[in-house]
Regions:
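Bacterial N-terminal signal peptides that target proteins for export
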Residues: 2-13
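C-terminal segment of classical bacterial N-terminal signal peptides
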Residues: 17-27
């Protein structure tokens, strides 16, 4: 009888572990199976706990990770150039110094992600969620951020040369010392507040500001589209 109870306890424990794993395993419905296998190969990951997923410097160039859940994963220094990350969940992930050049990041959740010094050159970030993301010193040259959400994001010293920010929401964002030379800022939106958007010392030379609302933005020392240096707090371009 005692042995029977021990076996029952053992099988109950195994069943509990299986159910726990199934419950917490992240959805990867549209992600390519081979690419996901490559993602896990030779890397230590706990499939149901992505925050323990160590994918530092992994090579996923051109991988199909559409709708994959990599929330909280460590992808610092990873090569994701040309990868399909449409509608993927990368919230809270570490992508510092990662290469995402020419990647498809349409509708992707990158909220609160660490994107310090990441390379987004010529990347499509349409409707991406970059709320509270850290993009300091990131390369966004020629990137398309159409209708992206950058609420409260840190873009200090980022390179946004020739980038498209048409309709982007940068309320409360930090763009101090950011290079916005020749960027498209049509319908760029800020909201006057005690927590103003910081564009101090940013370079806006040659930028398109048609319809941009910069009222309340901090523009002290910013180089304006005509090359002049602004000394006012903010203004509205209609």
């Amino acid at each position: 009888m005692k042995r029977l109870l021990t076996l029952k306890t053992f099988f109950a424990a195994v069943l509990a572990i299986v159910l726990f794993t199934l419950y917490f395993t992240p959805p990867v419905m549209a992600a390519n199976t081979e690419d996901l296998s490559q993602l896990l190969k030779d890397n230590w990951c706990v499939s149901f706990l992505w925050k323990q997923c160590d994918l530092i410097a992994v090579d996923l160039q051109g991988a199909n990770l559409q709708e994959a859940n990599l929330s909280g994963a460590n992808l610092s220094g990873a090569n994701l150039s040309g990868a399909n990350l449409k509608n993927a969940d990368l919230s809270d992930a570490d992508l510092s110094r990662a290469n995402l050049a020419n990647a498809d990041i349409l509708g992707t959740d990158l909220s609160r992600a660490n994107l310090t010094e990441a390379n987004f050159k010529s990347t499509r970030l349409w409707d991406a969620n970059l709320t509270l993301a850290n993009l300091s010193r990131a390369n966004l040259q020629n990137a398309n951020l159409l209708d992206s959400r950058l609420w409260g994001s840190n873009l200090a010293q980022a390179n946004l040369t020739d980038a498209t920010l048409h309709g982007a929401d940068l309320q409360y964002a930090n763009l101090a010392y950011t290079n916005l030379t020749n960027a498209d800022l049509q319908s760029f939106f800020f909201r006057g507040s005690k927590q103003v958007t910081n564009l101090s010392n940013a370079n806006l030379e040659g930028a398109t500001l048609t319809g941009a609302n910069l009222r309340g933005a901090l523009l002290t020392g910013a180089i304006m589209p005509d090359g002049s240096i602004n000394e006012e707090i903010g203004f509205n371009l209609n």
